[in-house]
Amino acid sequence: METIFAQSSAFGKAGVAVFRISGPKSLEVLQLLTGRKDFKSRLMYYQQITVPETKELIDNVMVVYFKSPGSFTGEDVVEIHTHGSKAISIILTNALLNIAGIRLAEAGEFTKRAFLNNKFDLTAAEGIADLINAETIMQHKQAIRQANGKLEELYNNWRSQLLKIISLLEAYIDFPDEDIPDTVLNEVTNTHTILVNTISEYLNDNRKGELLRSGLKLAIIGPPNVGKSSLLNFLMQRDIAIVSNIAGTTRDIIEGHLDIGGYPIILQDTAGIGEESSDIIEQEGIKRAINSAKTADIKIIMFDAEKLDSSINEDIINLIDENTITIINKIDLIEASKIFSIENKYKCLRVSVKNNIALSSILKNIENIAENMAGFTETPYITNQRHRNYLQQALSHLTAFSLDNDLVLATEDIRMTARCIGAIMGVINVEEILGEIFKNFCIGK
């Protein structure tokens, strides 16, 4: 196995930069950089490092050596903590590249080696990637649970039950003339039924884990000049949309990313949906607005308190569902009695975006819907499509199983189910999917 290295911290100015080296030559490389031979595993040393050929001083650093297998990758590993200087990073990188037998790591290669050395399964490796990319508290909770083996524990439990069924059935394949005892038949049938129901229910999760991982899309919908862009700017706490009293100012979809209650929200401000426009660009904006609303996880539909009759049109009303927040904006400009019937009919919140009236209620409603759509349960969620695909295949094989069929074929259905579950964790030969998973890691991880 080659020795690899990379800067694990972000490149640029910082208090500290961390370089990681993994492989059989790790300790030798550290000795070349420091001129010291007596490093002990798991002790931090304050050292000077130099360019091996010229002995030019690179930096005063902290170094630590982890002897195999007691390291992240399971190999000999060295970490070098330098000052976070671009110049130091460049000089040290060049010095390492000039040492024979060491090369720059590929994206995700350290984690890939850890997986190949049985430090964790594939679901945990994916959890580490999600942990690095997590931007909100809820994304962190989901990722840390997966990185710490909760998904592996769940899938391992299912796989163990499947292997138990296989072992019970295979004992009778070589003796076709013998009847399978009722106790064995009952155990196989009961376990099979429980697994079918459990995996079916698990797949019927409304993609909560994937929503939390990628972010919930929230579309702000309404007629022209109702205050959608002003609401977007309030939610983002900065101006990212042009605010104007001219109808049709927003002609395309404007996006912003937000953390509400720990949930990742992707905000979309859309073009106003109103009367038929003769402007081709505006027509396209309206078409995109309706499509955006139809694919959004959460919708905010805004009505104009001064123009309720024109605000409420069929295109907008048809978009209302259980995950829609309806609001009447500009309530400061009209008497409350004039909006009472509409407020009750569509369960609207009364707000004024311009004067910051009741806007906290919008945030609370967004958080409540997000929690309902992607809130936590005791059972860890499916977090990406790869898992879902294998689980659907597993369920297909599992439902095809029948003891009325040939025993060999019935056992093969269970074996294929176990293989699909195993593929999620990487306990079978999955070389073809490793590249796809680890290419999404950053260099140095």
UniProtKB/Swiss-Prot annotation:
<comment type="similarity">
    <text>Belongs to the TRAFAC class TrmE-Era-EngA-EngB-Septin-like GTPase superfamily. TrmE GTPase family.</text>
</comment>
<keyword id="KW-0630">Potassium</keyword>
<dbReference type="InterPro" id="IPR006073">
    <property type="entry name" value="GTP-bd"/>
</dbReference>
<dbReference type="GO" id="GO:0030488">
    <property type="term" value="P:tRNA methylation"/>
</dbReference>
<dbReference type="GO" id="GO:0003924">
    <property type="term" value="F:GTPase activity"/>
</dbReference>
<feature type="binding site">
    <location>
        <position position="250"/>
    </location>
    <ligand>
        <name>Mg(2+)</name>
    </ligand>
</feature>
<feature type="binding site">
    <location>
        <position position="246"/>
    </location>
    <ligand>
        <name>K(+)</name>
    </ligand>
</feature>
<comment type="function">
    <text>Exhibits a very high intrinsic GTPase hydrolysis rate. Involved in the addition of a carboxymethylaminomethyl (cmnm) group at the wobble position (U34) of certain tRNAs, forming tRNA-cmnm(5)s(2)U34.</text>
</comment>
<dbReference type="InterPro" id="IPR025867">
    <property type="entry name" value="MnmE_helical"/>
</dbReference>
<dbReference type="Pfam" id="PF12631">
    <property type="entry name" value="MnmE_helical"/>
</dbReference>
<feature type="domain" description="TrmE-type G">
    <location>
        <begin position="215"/>
        <end position="371"/>
    </location>
</feature>
<keyword id="KW-0378">Hydrolase</keyword>
<dbReference type="InterPro" id="IPR027266">
    <property type="entry name" value="TrmE/GcvT_dom1"/>
</dbReference>
<dbReference type="InterPro" id="IPR031168">
    <property type="entry name" value="G_TrmE"/>
</dbReference>
<comment type="subunit">
    <text>Homodimer. Heterotetramer of two MnmE and two MnmG subunits.</text>
</comment>
<dbReference type="InterPro" id="IPR027417">
    <property type="entry name" value="P-loop_NTPase"/>
</dbReference>
<feature type="binding site">
    <location>
        <position position="229"/>
    </location>
    <ligand>
        <name>Mg(2+)</name>
    </ligand>
</feature>
<keyword id="KW-0479">Metal-binding</keyword>
<dbReference type="GO" id="GO:0046872">
    <property type="term" value="F:metal ion binding"/>
</dbReference>
<keyword id="KW-0460">Magnesium</keyword>
<feature type="binding site">
    <location>
        <begin position="244"/>
        <end position="250"/>
    </location>
    <ligand>
        <name>GTP</name>
    </ligand>
</feature>
<keyword id="KW-0342">GTP-binding</keyword>
<feature type="binding site">
    <location>
        <begin position="269"/>
        <end position="272"/>
    </location>
    <ligand>
        <name>GTP</name>
    </ligand>
</feature>
<feature type="binding site">
    <location>
        <position position="119"/>
    </location>
    <ligand>
        <name>(6S)-5-formyl-5,6,7,8-tetrahydrofolate</name>
    </ligand>
</feature>
<feature type="binding site">
    <location>
        <begin position="225"/>
        <end position="230"/>
    </location>
    <ligand>
        <name>GTP</name>
    </ligand>
</feature>
<protein>
    <recommendedName>
        <fullName>tRNA modification GTPase MnmE</fullName>
        <ecNumber>3.6.-.-</ecNumber>
    </recommendedName>
</protein>
<dbReference type="Pfam" id="PF10396">
    <property type="entry name" value="TrmE_N"/>
</dbReference>
<keyword id="KW-0547">Nucleotide-binding</keyword>
<dbReference type="InterPro" id="IPR005225">
    <property type="entry name" value="Small_GTP-bd"/>
</dbReference>
<feature type="binding site">
    <location>
        <position position="244"/>
    </location>
    <ligand>
        <name>K(+)</name>
    </ligand>
</feature>
<feature type="binding site">
    <location>
        <position position="225"/>
    </location>
    <ligand>
        <name>K(+)</name>
    </ligand>
</feature>
<keyword id="KW-0963">Cytoplasm</keyword>
<feature type="binding site">
    <location>
        <position position="79"/>
    </location>
    <ligand>
        <name>(6S)-5-formyl-5,6,7,8-tetrahydrofolate</name>
    </ligand>
</feature>
<feature type="binding site">
    <location>
        <position position="445"/>
    </location>
    <ligand>
        <name>(6S)-5-formyl-5,6,7,8-tetrahydrofolate</name>
    </ligand>
</feature>
<dbReference type="InterPro" id="IPR018948">
    <property type="entry name" value="GTP-bd_TrmE_N"/>
</dbReference>
<dbReference type="GO" id="GO:0002098">
    <property type="term" value="P:tRNA wobble uridine modification"/>
</dbReference>
<dbReference type="GO" id="GO:0005737">
    <property type="term" value="C:cytoplasm"/>
</dbReference>
<dbReference type="InterPro" id="IPR004520">
    <property type="entry name" value="GTPase_MnmE"/>
</dbReference>
<dbReference type="InterPro" id="IPR027368">
    <property type="entry name" value="MnmE_dom2"/>
</dbReference>
<dbReference type="GO" id="GO:0005525">
    <property type="term" value="F:GTP binding"/>
</dbReference>
<dbReference type="Pfam" id="PF01926">
    <property type="entry name" value="MMR_HSR1"/>
</dbReference>
<feature type="binding site">
    <location>
        <position position="20"/>
    </location>
    <ligand>
        <name>(6S)-5-formyl-5,6,7,8-tetrahydrofolate</name>
    </ligand>
</feature>
